[in-house]
């Protein structure tokens, strides 16, 4: 049975978000096409996602010195435990669907923090004499991103930092097959917003058949 993580990073629901509407349409279609698969929703705005801070660095330092979990402070234990939960959940899944809005050329900060929970040496990648090697081979991802302007092509494609960063990090940890659905131009062309949304939903439903 394939396990799919539906990872969202939007404080709005599908009623108030073009990206979430497309994401939910994809998941609904995926479930219809693959009823035997397990889909787990991870709402990053309602999930404990520790940022890498002084506590985390201190905990890693203690581990490197040979100390155990019991040597950590309570704050360090809580953060490390939450990070490990996020990491283990991700590692034991087969497919990943990220749904994010673009905020100031990137995605919400919680997505970066989540990726920092995942890129862990010895777990999702390893160092070799030829450089780092990703360990999560054989998995695939989909990124659905909503943007008010057009960023998938043209002069602003170079500043689509969220899309490029997510693809880079996933590739670094071994997830080299990443699909992308752009839900874009709704603010630049408000008269076409509904048309843009419907086209993206149709695209998502079609992709769900082969994802």
From Swiss-Prot:
Gene Ontology MF terms in the entry: electron transfer activity; FMN binding; oxidoreductase activity, acting on NAD(P)H as acceptor; oxidoreductase activity, acting on NAD(P)H, quinone or similar compound as acceptor
Gene3D superfamilies recorded: 3.40.50.360
Reactions mediated catalytically: 2 a quinone + NADH + H(+) = 2 a 1,4-benzosemiquinone + NAD(+); N,N-dimethyl-1,4-phenylenediamine + anthranilate + 2 NAD(+) = 2-(4-dimethylaminophenyl)diazenylbenzoate + 2 NADH + 2 H(+)
Name of this protein: FMN-dependent NADH:quinone oxidoreductase 2
Enzyme class per UniProt: oxidoreductase
Cofactor(s) recorded in Swiss-Prot or TrEMBL: FMN
Cofactor annotation remark: Binds 1 FMN per subunit.
Subunit structure: Homodimer.
Binding site for FMN: 102-105
EC id: 1.6.5.-, 1.7.1.17
Keywords: Flavoprotein, FMN, NAD, Oxidoreductase
Upper classification of the organism: Bacteria, Bacillati, Bacillota, Bacilli, Bacillales
Family of this protein: Belongs to the azoreductase type 1 family.
Function: Quinone reductase that provides resistance to thiol-specific stress caused by electrophilic quinones. Also exhibits azoreductase activity. Catalyzes the reductive cleavage of the azo bond in aromatic azo compounds to the corresponding amines.
SUPFAM superfamilies: Flavoproteins
Record bears the keyword NAD: yes
Listed PANTHER family: FMN-DEPENDENT NADH-AZOREDUCTASE 1, FMN-DEPENDENT NADH:QUINONE OXIDOREDUCTASE
């Amino acid at each position: 049975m394939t396990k799919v993580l539906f990872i969202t990073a939007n404080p709005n629901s599908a009623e108030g978000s073009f990206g979430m509407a497309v994401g939910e349409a994809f998941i609904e279609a995926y479930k219809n096409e693959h009823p035997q698969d397990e889909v787990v929703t991870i709402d990053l705005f309602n999930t404990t996602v520790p940022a890498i801070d002084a506590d985390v660095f201190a905990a890693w330092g203690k581990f490197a010195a040979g100390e155990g979990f019991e040597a950590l402070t309570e704050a360090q234990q809580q953060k490390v435990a939450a990070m490990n939960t996020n990491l283990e959940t991700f590692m034991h899944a087969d497919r990943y669907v990220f749904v994010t809005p673009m905020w100031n050329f990137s995605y919400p900060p919680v997505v970066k923090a989540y990726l920092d929970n995942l890129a862990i040496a010895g777990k999702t990648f390893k160092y070799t004499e030829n450089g780092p090697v990703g360990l999560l081979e054989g998995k695939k991802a989909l990124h659905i991103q909503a943007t008010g302007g057009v960023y998938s092509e043209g002069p602003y494609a170079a500043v689509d930092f969220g899309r490029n960063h997510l693809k880079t990090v996933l590739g670094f940890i071994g997830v080299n097959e990443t699909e992308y659905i752009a839900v874009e131009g709704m603010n630049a062309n408000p008269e076409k917003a509904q048309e843009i949304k419907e086209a993206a939903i149709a695209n998502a439903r079609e992709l769900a058949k082969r994802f």
